[in-house]
Amino acid sequence: MNLFDLQSMETPKEEAMGDVETGSRASLLLCGDSSLSITTCN
């Protein structure tokens, strides 16, 4: 789950404070293990 941690750190905490927990998990599941899944799916 290193990708998840890296993506959470890359995402601005101000914008995605709550979305990091739910949004990134959903985007990882939907988009796969892409390093840009948060950016692409959000």
UniProtKB/Swiss-Prot annotation:
2,3-didehydroalanine (Ser) carried by residues: S27, S37
Record-annotated disulphide pairs: none
A GO CC term assigned to this protein in UniProt: spore wall
InterPro entries: RamS
Phenotype when the gene is knocked out: Single deletion of ramS leads to a severe delay in aerial hyphae growth. Deletion of the ramC-ramS-ramA-ramB operon on rich medium leads to an initially bald (no aerial hyphae) phenotype; after 4 days develops a substantial aerial mycelium. Wild-type mycelium on minimal medium. No expression of SapB, normal expression of chaplins. A complete chaplin-negative plus ram-negative strain (deletion of ramR or the ramC-ramS-ramA-ramB operon) leads to the complete loss of robust aerial hyphae.
Induction annotation: The RamS precursor protein (detected by an anti-propeptide antibody and by a C-terminal His-tag) is detected from at least 16 hours post-germination on both rich and minimal media and is detected for at least 52 hours (at protein level). The mature lanthionine-containing peptide SapB is expressed by 3 days growth on rich medium, expression increases slightly over 7 days (at protein level). Expression requires ramR, not expressed in minimal medium (at protein level).
Propeptide feature: residues: 1-21
Residue location of crosslink Lanthionine (Ser-Cys): S24-C31, S34-C41
Domain of life: Bacteria
Post-translational modification note: Maturation involves the enzymatic conversion of Ser into dehydrated AA and the formation of thioether bonds with cysteine, probably by RamC. This is followed by membrane translocation and cleavage of the modified precursor. The RamS precursor protein (detected by an anti-propeptide antibody and by a C-terminal His-tag) is detected from at least 16 hours post-germination; its apparent molecular weight decreases starting from about 34 hours, when its probable modifying enzyme ramC is transcribed.
One Pfam family, short name: RamS
UniProtKB keywords: Cell membrane, Membrane, Secreted, Thioether bond
N-terminal signal peptide: none
Location of region: Disordered: 1-21
Family the entry assigns: Belongs to the lanthionine-containing morphogen family.
Official protein name in the record: Lanthionine-containing peptide SapB precursor RamS
Taxonomic lineage from the root: Bacteria, Bacillati, Actinomycetota, Actinomycetes, Kitasatosporales
